[in-house]
Amino acid sequence: MNSTTMNIPAQAQAKFREGLALHQQGQLAPAQALYEQVLQLIPTHFDALYLSGVLAAESNNPEGALVMFDKAIDSVPTHVNAHIDRGMVLCKLGRHGPALQNFEKALTLAPNNSEAYYGLGSAHMQMEEHETALQYFDRALALAPNYPEAHGDRGAVLQSLGRLDEALQSIERAIALAPTVEVNHYNRGFVLSALGRNDEAMTSYDKAIELKPDYATAYNNRGNLNWTLTRHRAAIEDFDAALSIKPDLPDLFGMRLHMKMAVCDWPALEAQKKLLVEMIDRGERAASPFAAMAALDTLDMQRKCAQIWLKSKRVAGAALGSLRKPPRHKRIRVAYVSSEFRESPAAYNMVGLFENHDRTRFETIAISAGPDNPGEMRSRLKRAFDVFVDAGKKSDIAIAALMREMEIDIAVDSMGPTGDDRTGIFIARGAPIQVNHFGFASGASHFEYIVADPIAIPPDHRAYYLEKMASLPHTLFATDRERRIAERTPTRAEAGLPEDGFVFCSFNNSYKITPEVFDVWMRLLNKVPGSVLWLRGTNSLMPGNLREEAHKRGIDPARLVFAPIAPKMEDHLARLRLADLFVDCFAFNAQTTASDALWAGVPVLTCLGPTMVSRVAGGLLNAIDMPELITRTHDQYEALAFSLATEPRRLAQIRAKLAENRLCKPLFDTPLFTRHLENAYTQMYERYQADLPIEDIQVRA
């Protein structure tokens, strides 16, 4: 044997020590080069194999890491950390089954290894098996009480389970042990925001971004929080930052576009909408279905967006197992699921429905999936139901499991994929019959039925919906005929309106206002001397942007009047009487605000569009027998608005008819609407109990 051969082990060990020192200093590339030299000398050198795997994992090369960990395990099959690290890499790749096998093998080699238990918890957390994950994190912490990663991920799991106070304790323990780990500050911000402790949440997001300046999800969540806190400019800046860092962050592009629409920032609007369509056509999750409803003007694109969004939502509904058929109940158990069971537009519309249910035939349950905001409306809602479940802090899976325990027959989604999305409850199958009462093209197989009406969802739109139709004869939206209007109507001067000029009104949410409808409104102001446009000031940036747009169109910005939020709903309804004509938006109609105007006696002018949300107001007008206010083209809309603004007698006739129809036509006949909906529920239930296939349901007038 020559001297060179005799020195190979010593050469290899020297190079390994040099590589290890560089690795520990964070110099990954030169360290890797030295590990490779070691392996050229001794291909089975375990430490070089193992640390090459660690280095590859640190370099975001998981496939390369797997190759090296496999070689390391072949060299030393009993090395515990090699099995654990291989399992963590497999978790990163989403290969959870093999990862679990590695962690379990590690535990057979070292039964009290806290890192192996942590790995099992991580895998089950990623599989959204949160209860199982929690058990493993607890085992890890029983063995290693000062394990910061286990505390942090335990907090994340508790957050997913809706156990927010416990989650906060775990996350804060993790921060105390490892104060520079950015994800724990991010998770702390998320939990604090959910608890309504917004200022503290903001501090946590700030810290997360300070520790990781390219933390896109932290910018995204801080943007949402800034919007909630009415810091609108800061919110958009945060969304811009998130988009520049991670353009493919799920839903981010659509949310930023939605915010731009909300502040009426239009210079790049059409280009952004076109880009959104291209992203959805490529199958990218670029927007939530709610954001898409305002930005996309075809049912086909709205459905595509919804299907992509649902496909990527990883809710472990299978964890609950198959749904057992509940026994026939004396009263049909109907659960309404919403995060809006508080002072909210949805609650003002729907509370009358809940109060009018036939309690001899239906047992009504409220699943309140949002915050508990005490107030007059919350109290009224609690009285309206047989059972009121405050589930705001529960996870989607926990709520679905609870609904199964309660043997709910029919679960009604009364909110859809809004900001407080709880779609997971329905994906996890809380009831055997699930009903979409939000009206959007969900693309979802977890709803059996969608509530429809002849205008909002006409027969030729049927192909865009997977659900069977439960068609009501007049309107699919509930109203409350008991809504009080304050006796005193404020003066026009008090509302900032001219005493004599014609008042066009549109209290729509600002994201519904588009350049197309604004062009029409400005032409109307130009053609009707002394007229004004009365809008709702929904955020701090919208008035300035719209005034600038008016100026561009040659209209004095002072002719745009922005109403503040009224202290009480009854005061808002009273001030609506000051308007002469409510002019609707095109792509996304007024719903609650149109109902408000009609209840206050103000005519609503609308134009039917190609999507459900662009036909809603038409459905309301049809139900109050005012078809003469439904137009089919933008030109017709503009011509009729001008006619009503310049022909006082014609407008007076319209207002007189509205006053007469208000209490004698179906729109505000809450008991009648309730009977029709109950008819639909009964047909759904009887078909299910008889094991008949799901079919369209037509409720007759």
Predicted regions and their residues:
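Substrate-binding clefts and catalytic carboxylate motifs of secreted carbohydrate-active enzymes
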Residues: C505-E516
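Donor-sugar nucleotide-binding helix/loop cap in glycosyltransferases
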Residues: V583, A597
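Alpha-helical solenoid repeat scaffolds of the TPR/TPR-like class and their adjacent stem/linker regions
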Residues: M1-L497, N509, D519, E548-I555, ...
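Glycine-rich phosphate-binding loop and adjacent beta-alpha segment
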Residues: C607-L608, M612-V616
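A conserved nucleotide-sugar
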Residues: Y117, R361-E363, M522-K552
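Short Ser/Thr-rich beta->loop micro-motif in glycosyltransferases that lines
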Residues: M415, D584-A590, L608
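Short, well-ordered beta-strand segments
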Residues: R333-A335, C505, W534, L605
